[in-house]
Amino acid sequence: MNNKTVITHFLLLGLPIPPEHQQLFFALFLIMYLTTFLGNLLIVVLVQLDSHLHTPMYLFLSNLSFSDLCFSSVTMLKLLQNIQSQVPSISYAGCLTQIFFFLLFGYLGNFLLVAMAYDRYVAICFPLHYTNIMSHKLCTCLLLVFWIMTSSHAMMHTLLAARLSFCENNVLLNFFCDLFVLLKLACSDTYVNELMIHIMGVIIIVIPFVLIVISYAKIISSILKVPSTQSIHKVFSTCGSHLSVVSLFYGTIIGLYLCPSGDNFSLKGSAMAMMYTVVTPMLNPFIYSLRNRDMKQALIRVTCSKKISLPW
C-alpha cells in the first residue's frame, strides 16, 4: 500500500527550460501574455464604448474576449512567476484555485462559441426575424445560464479534487495544475472524478461542438438553396473569423485529450496545452479584428471622440 502524506505544494515540471534560457523564455511568454491581455481588453473596451457594437454578436464577442483574457491569466501569471523565481511550484490551495478558474473560463468560452454560431445561423437564415429572435433578453439569459453552468461545473470538479489523497510524488508534468494530471498522482480512488469528467465532458464539450456543427450545416444548406457569389461572400465574411477560432479551440483539445500519446502530458502535451491556453486566446483578437470593418471603424470613432474631448 502506498504511504499517504500531506501535500502542501506541487512541482510544475511540464516545461523543462534550461537555466541559461530562463530569461529568454520569460521575455517571450511575457510578450505573449501582454499581447493577449491588451488585445482582448481592447475588444471589451470598444464594445462597451461604441454604441454601434451593442449587438448580440459583439456582446458575445466581448464576453469571449473577457473569458480569454482571464483564461490566459489563470495559467500565464503563475508560469511567469515560476520562471522568474526559478522555483516551478504551486501550493495545494493555489492548485485547486487554478483548476477552478481554468475550468470556469475555459468552458465559458466554449459555450460562447456556441452562442456566436447560433447568432450567425439566425442572421443568415432568418435575417428578417433576427432582431426579434436575438433579443437583449435572450442574450442576457444565455449569458446568465452559461455563467451558472460553468461555475457549477468548475466547483464540482474542484471539490471532488479536494477530497483526493496523495502520496509522496508531487510532480505535475505540466506548466499548470491540470485536473487530468492531478488525478494521476492521487493515491485514493479516482473513479468518481473520472466518471464525472466523462459525463460532464459530453455536456460541456461534445454537445456544444455538435450544436456548432449543426448551426453551420444549416447555414451551408440555406446558402446552397440560393447559390450566388454574394451569398457565399456573406457567409465567409460573417462566419470566417468564428470558424477559425472554433477550429483552433477544438483542434487543440481533440489533439490533446481525445488523441493522447503514450505520455499524455509529456513535453508534447505541454506544448499542445500551451496552444489552447496561451496561443489561441492571443490570436483571437487578431482573427476577429484584422478583417472586421466594424471593429476598425469603432476604434477610429472611439479614438477620435477621445481626441475631440481633450481640452487642448
UniProtKB/Swiss-Prot annotation:
Disulfide bond as UniProt keyword: yes
Annotated GO CC locations? plasma membrane
Q: In which tissues is it expressed?
A: Olfactory epithelium.
Give the membrane topology, semicolon-separated if more than one: Multi-pass membrane protein
* Stretches in topological domain Cytoplasmic: 49-55, 119-137, 218-234, 291-312
User: Where does the UniProt annotation locate this protein?
Assistant: Cell membrane
Instruction: Tell me the protein's name.
Output: Olfactory receptor 1493
Task: Name the family the entry cites.
Answer: Belongs to the G-protein coupled receptor 1 family.
**Glycan attachment sites:** 3
Q: Name one GO biological process term.
A: signal transduction
Annotated coiled-coil segments of the chain: none
Give an example GO molecular function.
G protein-coupled receptor activity
Cite the entry's keywords alphabetically: Cell membrane, Disulfide bond, G-protein coupled receptor, Glycoprotein, Membrane, Olfaction, Receptor, Sensory transduction, Transducer, Transmembrane, Transmembrane helix
Side Extracellular, residues: 1-23, 78-98, 157-194, 259-270
Q: Which PROSITE patterns has this protein been placed in?
A: G_PROTEIN_RECEP_F1_1, G_PROTEIN_RECEP_F1_2
Protein function: Odorant receptor.
Domain of life, source organism? Eukaryota
Q: Which residues cross the membrane?
A: 24-48, 56-77, 99-118, 138-156, 195-217, 235-258, 271-290
The encoding gene is: Olr1493
**Disulfide bridge map:** 95-187
